[in-house]
């Protein structure tokens, strides 16, 4: 999963941000 703002709200990192 990429880190940072996503271009689309349907992005996986937007739905479930894996920043831990």
Swiss-Prot record:
Main location: secreted
GO molecular function: serine-type peptidase activity
An annotated GO cellular component: extracellular region
Subcellular location: Secreted
Biological processes annotated in GO: innate immune response; proteolysis
UniProt entry keywords in alphabetical sequence: Hydrolase, Immunity, Innate immunity, Protease, Secreted, Serine protease
EC identifiers of the protein: 3.4.21.-
Keyword Secreted: yes
Domain of life: Eukaryota
Similarity field: Belongs to the peptidase S1 family.
Job description of the protein: Binds the A.niger cell wall component alpha-1,3-glucan, a fungal pathogen-associated molecular pattern (PAMP) that activates the host immune response.
Protein name: Putative serine protease
Organism: Galleria mellonella
